[in-house]
């Protein structure tokens, strides 16, 4: 179920990036974060990333983190989380989705 949610949540940030495509292509969404505190007065991209990671944590669990890397309009979106409770040990998972903007 977590893997499916990671794919769905990747689509969520992709939609936000397409709505702000110029900034996305310029790298405004690039980075990796587990932080949901956000910065007051930040950019639309910052707000989108904060909302996305908050949604990841609600859907997948508090260990969820997100990474976006866009270069020349091609973006890799990665969702990573630890599912050790479900697998009775350390179990780090990641799902990467590649999209063209």
Each PLM stretch: what is its role?
Residues 1-101:
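Flexible, low-complexity segments enriched in proline/glycine/serine and punctuated by aromatic residues
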